[in-house]
Amino acid sequence: MIPTLLLLGATGDLARRYLFPALGALHLADRLPDGFRVVGAARGELDGNGLRRLAGDDLPADMLTYHPVDLADPSSLAAAVDGTHGPVAVYLALPPGVFATTIQSLAALDLAPESRIVVEKPFGDDFESARALNALLAHSGADGYRVDHVLGLETVQRLVAMRRNMPVVERFWNAGKVDRVEILWEETLGLEGRAGYFDRAGALKDVLQNHMLQLLALVGMELPRDSAELHERKLAVLRAARVAGTGRRARYTAGRLADGREVPDYADEDGVDPLRCTETYAEVALELQTTGWTGARFLMRAGKALARKRKLVVLLLQNGVELEIGIDGPEDIVLRVAAATGDALELRAPAPSDGLPAYAHVLLDVLAGTNELSVGAEEAERAWCVVAPVLAAWEAGTVPMEEYAAGSAGPS
């Protein structure tokens, strides 16, 4: 395994909320390699205990070092890498706007063989910028790794395992038995301090174009024979995906969230530019032009400030049976069979867990030098192609902006 993690942006929100807790969980579970080191780096200075305070109590002090860096200066980054042995995993916990400068600086360092440069979504803002990011990674001298943390969720990994290990499920996993597949990413919270990013992205770019298309790929793909074939099968789905229509978009108006808090109209939220016409709700229908799924409809729906938190994959079978696979709240697998009386028999299986958060699984994949939980370069590009017709229609103003009250079920 890679013995050193260089964490750029170590003082930021991503590191504090997700990466350090994930590293702590891996250390407590004895899943990190012997002699493992975390080199934190950011622009500001920290005192001797500064990184330890950020990292929390689950990581020992002798595992942590800190270097102030200038991302545009290769010699500054070289000082952070100096003294490490073997390959390094460089995690860019940074705003996407500085990815290019940082990768170019890293390319000048001549990192050890088998080193990796890790970037978070969004992978560009359209097809061309995604391709440009891929080109930078390809010429960096290190292996590029694209993180979509949803792939690290146990529930998502279980989806593929269920198909592989339960032949009865795989037998009805096609358009001959399934009428419709719904992929839902419904959140009860509003902006929660993310207006600076979200107002420039919107629901479609924030989650539907990445998290939800990855789920679509895992649902629609032919089962890979091994991990090496996984990205090929996912890419085949994205190549076969076609939007049906130009979708729906909406934004919330003043209302009461599920937790009781009152929120104003989205356009009046702090940090929001009302002239951007940013959607907080996105709905897109797709079809897969593949042998197994021709004729079935896929509906993807994402929204903020809704009545219920639901992140699910739902298969609606032609015989009235419904299979609900929880992704992140609820996380159970639920099978519903409609009865003649109008009632339904419901069978519920709780999700097994190894106790590790999604980012812990992602970090293990990074450090092991594998790519099972990554987004492939062509996948990142093709995902933008899938949603391009919808984005073009929305930017042209041909799709109306609907409204829904915060805390409601969404637009009618």
Which role fits each region the language model picked out?
Residues M1-V118, F123-S412:
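Secretory/organelle targeting and membrane-embedding segments
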